[in-house]
């Protein structure tokens, strides 16, 4: 798509989304566009500090979990001693950026609104980790906490997966992995998916939307994919292109959230339409006026806070 033919997104977004876009952090250096991945990761962590401030306090513990790839850090957010379930959270960042600090506020609010234990998994980033390593790390963490639930004083009889962007893909892929390989980690009561990518290679929204403001041009998306996958054949794997998996049976209840001006919106729409057509329990909600990644901005955006509350409410309704 010729750039001039794309929608004028920054003119169309909501007033509160514009406020976020125009919020300056004077102490922040410029984005290292030509820098190394390590430099971009460092910048992303610094930039997110402002947006993570003021999150609710609660009991928080960090644990290292063994996997066949080595130790993976996890962080437990415990809003109450007797949690009705445990939610595993997978952060976004195009598979190449992000960590437990960049998504701290999201996880704390999700724990607070659901009153469930939330476990963030600091999976190995790409290109250091190639598909399917990250999914195997997530599954290993689930199995570990299921086996050690009594020691960690968590309720693993009912679990869920949640994630934003690339983390949403990982959340659903992990749930399908457990189903397909018949791995018992407790009943998967629900999956919470905020503006994920699920396997479309092209779409109307991918053509009309995406630019420097969200890091989701066609070139950006190709770069993330090439960093994450091991080879070209992986593009058709049912744990990367989730539309190649069996979505007609035993899919856990899915909350699917879409951002109106997100180039990945059609992925969410297609996922919802596919699940609904096969009577799989699901709910789709579109958040008007929003850009991809809006969930980070609950400090300033009521819509972001609403989206987190909606996901938490959906999950607790499944328990």
Curated annotation (Swiss-Prot):
<feature type="active site">
    <location>
        <position position="262"/>
    </location>
</feature>
<dbReference type="InterPro" id="IPR050300">
    <property type="entry name" value="GDXG_lipolytic_enzyme"/>
</dbReference>
<feature type="short sequence motif" description="Involved in the stabilization of the negatively charged intermediate by the formation of the oxyanion hole">
    <location>
        <begin position="91"/>
        <end position="93"/>
    </location>
</feature>
<dbReference type="InterPro" id="IPR023508">
    <property type="entry name" value="Acetyl_esterase"/>
</dbReference>
<dbReference type="InterPro" id="IPR013094">
    <property type="entry name" value="AB_hydrolase_3"/>
</dbReference>
<dbReference type="GO" id="GO:0005737">
    <property type="term" value="C:cytoplasm"/>
</dbReference>
<comment type="similarity">
    <text>Belongs to the 'GDXG' lipolytic enzyme family.</text>
</comment>
<keyword id="KW-0963">Cytoplasm</keyword>
<protein>
    <recommendedName>
        <fullName>Acetyl esterase</fullName>
        <ecNumber>3.1.1.-</ecNumber>
    </recommendedName>
</protein>
<dbReference type="InterPro" id="IPR033140">
    <property type="entry name" value="Lipase_GDXG_put_SER_AS"/>
</dbReference>
<keyword id="KW-0378">Hydrolase</keyword>
<dbReference type="Pfam" id="PF07859">
    <property type="entry name" value="Abhydrolase_3"/>
</dbReference>
<comment type="subunit">
    <text>Homodimer. Interacts with MalT and MelA.</text>
</comment>
<comment type="function">
    <text>Displays esterase activity towards short chain fatty esters (acyl chain length of up to 8 carbons). Able to hydrolyze triacetylglycerol (triacetin) and tributyrylglycerol (tributyrin), but not trioleylglycerol (triolein) or cholesterol oleate. Negatively regulates MalT activity by antagonizing maltotriose binding. Inhibits MelA galactosidase activity.</text>
</comment>
<dbReference type="InterPro" id="IPR029058">
    <property type="entry name" value="AB_hydrolase_fold"/>
</dbReference>
<feature type="active site">
    <location>
        <position position="165"/>
    </location>
</feature>
<dbReference type="InterPro" id="IPR002168">
    <property type="entry name" value="Lipase_GDXG_HIS_AS"/>
</dbReference>
<feature type="active site">
    <location>
        <position position="292"/>
    </location>
</feature>
<keyword id="KW-0719">Serine esterase</keyword>
<dbReference type="GO" id="GO:0052689">
    <property type="term" value="F:carboxylic ester hydrolase activity"/>
</dbReference>
